[in-house]
């Protein structure tokens, strides 16, 4: 039996630009658990307010915190994955560690497929978001 640990997080834009934010927000705000109301209202809010107005404005904030290697969330998630894998390997514990995001690459389902392809028969999911909400636990 090969065990695996999947570090799960919400996700992040691929780049600190209006386009990067729009792509991320389009997927994120399409989830009915994020906006738990009428699908038509969700579509209107996403496509007529959030994508055209909020994404360009927030892109500036993302650009200020963006790191040389990418989004802080992705950079630190990658570092945590590598550190945990190194620790398990050093202890001689056969545990595969991967990171998966709900709304951006690397996606949770891709990480799970990779773990299964590597022979994982037991996968422990570890949510890295600190709060309970249907957008993080039910999606």
Residue ranges and their predicted role:
Residues 1-139:
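Active-site-proximal alpha-helix that buttresses catalytic centers in soluble enzyme cores
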């Amino acid at each position: 039996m090969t065990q695996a640990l999947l570090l799960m997080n919400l996700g992040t834009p691929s780049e600190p630009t209006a386009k990067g934010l729009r792509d991320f927000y389009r997927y994120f705000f399409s989830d009915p658990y994020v906006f738990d109301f009428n699908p038509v209202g969700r579509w209107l809010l996403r496509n007529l307010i959030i994508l055209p107005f909020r994404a360009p404005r927030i892109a500036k904030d993302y650009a200020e915190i963006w790191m040389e290697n990418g989004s802080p969330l992705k950079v630190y998630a990658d570092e945590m994955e590598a550190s945990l894998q190194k620790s398990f390997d050093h202890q001689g514990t056969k545990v595969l560690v991967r990171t998966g995001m709900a709304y951006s690459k690397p996606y949770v389902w891709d990480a799970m497929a990779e773990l299964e392809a590597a022979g994982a028969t037991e996968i422990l999911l570890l949510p890295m978001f600190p709060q309970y909400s249907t957008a993080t636990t039910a999606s």
